[in-house]
Regions:
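Polar low-complexity intrinsically disordered regions enriched in Ser/Thr and small residues
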Residues: 33-35, 74, 95
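Short beta-strand/loop turn elements enriched in aromatics
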Residues: 80-100
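Extended hydrophobic leader/signal-anchor segments used for secretion and membrane insertion
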Residues: 1-69, 91, 103-191
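Solvent-exposed edge beta-strands and adjacent loop segments
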Residues: 68, 75-82
Length: 191
């Protein structure tokens, strides 16, 4: 399931949407290799198919995203889909599952996470899995980061619990860098 070149295994990954670097938890924990981490992990939930957030009227198809050719975490293809980082845990497994989505208006269509900033602690997030099960997460907090802020806790968790972190852009659009000035992360915990 996890296939990376040696360069990618030993290098942090920069997420162009969120502006974060990702280092696989196996490397952070000193276990030596991504392969060992994959063997040690037992998949207990199916692949995520849909993300539902009733508080902001989101009902989106979940695409699998990995690492793009430029070394960045990939983003969903369209403005209405979300991307699950498939090199990390599945939503509902131990660790931080990460899902990104677009912000703003793209070709006149409000993007899936355009209103993510309106979520509040206690709001529910639902992930529908391939085998028909649903995992419920509860929003813990929202944090804003600058593009260069350290945000390792977005991808890595050491508490042995299942978390879901949603990432989108926010702030002012820079026409030169083609980046937004801030990143919004919604931290949620399995119910």
């Amino acid at each position: 399931m996890i296939m990376l070149s040696l360069v990618m295994v030993f290098s942090p990954v920069f997420d162009r949407l969120s502006g974060y670097h990702y280092v696989h938890p196996a490397l952070m924990a000193g276990r030596g290799s991504v392969l060992q981490a994959a063997i040690q992990e037992q998949t207990v939930v199916g692949l995520p198919l849909r993300l539902r957030i009733p508080a902001i009227h989101v009902d989106a198809v979940v695409e699998r995203v990995g690492i793009a050719s430029d070394g960045a975490m990939d983003v969903p293809k369209g403005p209405l889909e979300v991307g699950w980082f498939d090199l990390g845990p599945r939503p509902g497994e131990k660790g931080n599952a990460v899902i990104d989505g677009h912000f703003g208006t793209i070709k006149g269509i409000p993007a899936v996470f355009n209103n993510l900033y309106t979520l509040r602690a206690g709001d529910k997030i639902y992930i529908e899995h391939g085998q028909g099960t649903i995992t419920t997460f509860v929003v813990r907090e929202l944090k804003r980061f600058g593009p260069t802020d350290d945000a390792v806790d977005v991808f890595v968790s050491s508490d042995g619990k299942a978390h879901l972190n949603l990432i989108t852009c926010e702030g002012e659009w820079n026409k030169i860098t083609k980046l937004y000035s801030e990143r919004l992360v919604v931290f949620a915990d399995v119910e």
